Amino acid sequence: AGKYILNFGADKVRKYLTETIRRMVEDYGADYIKMDYNVDSGFVDGDFENERKAYLTWVGEMRERFENVLFEACSSGGMRMDYETLKHYSIVSTSDQVRDYLYPYIAGNVLSAALPEQAAVWSYPVSSKDVWTPSDGNVSSEKVVLNMVNAFLGRIHLASDLTKLSSENFALVKEGVEY
């Protein structure tokens, strides 16, 4: 199973994706769209710079057309953290790292590439041994606090099943958000 990058220089691609975005916004009421373009740029077959320009031009057109929609970029391991890309997005997801003890390295350095209000820092107060599926008994107050502190440097993006939190730990999340 290979990965493919769409050629935004092709009218067919732009028309298809423009219609897809239109449907999401106008028919389904989407006001937040994450553009998870998490593909290594080495997969581009041809002129990388023109492909990139065509993609970013299209993103700019979508932001102009749907000005009330927040478009989030994926940092793709830092490959999409350049100012040319960031100026086309409201928000950039800095990482989907779920290991709370590793995120401080990302959160502490991301501001060298993105503005705090643009840098989405994910907080996973509920996790289960570093995997996506939460379980009871694996949520400590220390883990909750570290996840919230990690997110303070940017725009907090809460994730995971918060209903699994005890009332004490939920209060810590609430305090972190209010802070």
Question: Which residues are covered by each model-predicted region?
Answer:
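Active-site groove signature of glycoside hydrolases
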Residues: 16-45
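Non-catalytic C-terminal accessory modules of carbohydrate-active enzymes
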Residues: 159-179
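Active/binding-pocket-proximal capping segment
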Residues: 38-41, 77-80, 168-169, 176
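Glycan-recognition surfaces
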Residues: 1-15, 19, 26, 52-53, ...
